[in-house]
Amino acid sequence: MKPGKPEVLFAPWRYEYLVAEKSGGCIFCEAAAASDGDESLVVYRGERVFVLLNRYPYTNGHLMVAPYGHEAWLSSSDAETLTELIGTIARSEKILVSAYHTDGLNVGINFGSAAGAGVAGHYHVHVVPRWNGDTNFMSVTASTRVVPEVPSVTLARLRPLFSEGSP
């Protein structure tokens, strides 16, 4: 690899995003209102929050936990929603460690477009599996991202674990 020149890996699902017409709507509100078919990528629905796959994941098993309400800030959510949010993040942690044998996780929120939020009007928490020696987040060090598992396989792996009442 030449310094300053990014490597390119094929990710066909990313191309779909780039060429698709943008609905202008909120992807989280749309997913919350959608049926539970695979197209929605919703893995779990709680009373106040839900879990869905990132359609353009950083790693295998990349989840997002979001409230049903269209809220830009944690401070906009009531205490019950925040309690369920944290509990669902903890449950997601246990499921991802069990399903993917992870060595760690990144958990984070970007508030506002200046902070990197792709959907600034509806906060969501990223839960991203990590492994010792993994090749992900290569974009930080080598301008490359590697994701070997397609989202439909991830959905088939994780949805049953959430519905079984696992961890």
Enumerate the language-model features and the residues they cover.
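HIT superfamily nucleotide-processing domains
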Residues: M1-P167
